[in-house]
């Protein structure tokens, strides 16, 4: 495929976001020249990292309105760059920020936008498979437009290096102050430690856990495995755990090496958040529960007996 793919990069404190490394891998798969745009502060030192992942040109957008995330202003910058360099494809990872910025840019360019694609096949038009209805189905579609604006589903494309020479171009954006409708008024540091989105192991609990106190054995197992505790929406709705622990369409989408789902029925909105897990183990008394039928492995039994037994066996083997 000829032409250029422009990748919208997410970064934080001088480091590329893992999501953007996934987007760069997807862009290289199209067979085009890959260029990237960074918007906001702390992007000056990213060219070497971008070069390591196959980027030929790094466009750095500068403006006082871009120091913090403002979707309207960021979308205007991307739209202006598209008008200037005429890429064939504009691509980002389908995070909240990636989808929001591409939607803003597409609206300004009067072009269609296809979000959360799991497969891209270029030709005279762009054939794609994408997640629909919160991930409950996969849709095959074709995008015909002068510029293809797409995001790729998070956690589905494996980052990999492809070193190349990268030049840097500064983009002096001209922005209307009216675009500054959003501004950051404070930043709150997350407590140090493994996060739900990055943990190698997640032990999730649902309504079947029974109470806030019922999560203690799950926390013990998670600690033994070097992981964290997650939960279903039913748990947060009951006030048993914080929304920050929720796995699902309206919570966090996870992709651990192992997800242990305890007492979780497997409603579609939860499955959307967990389906990228490499291995899923369900523990449930109901052999017909959705999570049990979709899991790679299942234990049919009372989680209050099964979880402590697993934890004890892990400790016994480590001690021997």
PLM region descriptions:
Residues 1-320:
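N-terminal glycine-rich FAD/FM-binding segment characteristic of electron-transfer flavoproteins
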């Amino acid at each position: 495929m000829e032409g250029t793919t422009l990748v919208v990069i997410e970064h934080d404190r001088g480091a590329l976001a893992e999501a953007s490394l996934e987007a760069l891998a997807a862009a290289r798969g199209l067979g085009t020249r890959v260029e990237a745009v960074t918007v906001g502060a702390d992007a000056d030192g990213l060219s070497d990292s971008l070069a390591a992942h196959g980027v030929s040109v790094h466009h750095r957008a500068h403006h006082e309105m871009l120091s913090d995330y403002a979707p309207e202003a960021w979308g205007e910058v991307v739209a202006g760059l598209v008008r200037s360099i005429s890429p064939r494809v504009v691509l980002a990872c389908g995070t909240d920020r990636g989808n929001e910025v591409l939607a803003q840019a597409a609206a300004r360019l009067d072009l269609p936008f296809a979000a959360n694609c799991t497969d891209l096949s270029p030709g005279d038009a762009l054939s794609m498979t994408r997640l629909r209805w919160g991930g409950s189905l996969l849709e095959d579609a074709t995008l015909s437009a002068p510029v293809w604006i797409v995001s790729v589903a998070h956690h589905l494309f494996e980052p990999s290096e492809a070193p190349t020479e990268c030049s840097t171009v500064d983009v002096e954006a001209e922005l209307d102050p009216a675009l500054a409708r959003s501004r950051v008024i404070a930043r709150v540091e997350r407590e140090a430690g493994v996060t739900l989105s990055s943990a190698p192991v997640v032990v999730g609990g649902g309504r079947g856990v029974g109470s806030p106190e019922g999560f203690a054995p799950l926390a013990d197992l998670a600690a033994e495995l070097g992981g964290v505790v997650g939960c279903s929406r039913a748990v947060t709705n009951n006030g048993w755990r914080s929304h920050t622990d929720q796995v699902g369409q309206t919570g966090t989408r996870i992709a651990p090496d192992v997800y242990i789902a305890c007492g979780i029925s497997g409603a579609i909105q939860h499955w959307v958040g967990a389906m990228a897990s490499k291995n899923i183990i369900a523990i449930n008394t109901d052999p017909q529960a959705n999570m049990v039928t979709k899991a790679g492995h299942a234990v049919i039994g009372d989680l209050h007996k099964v979880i402590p037994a697993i934890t004890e066996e892990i400790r016994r083997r480590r001690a021997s």
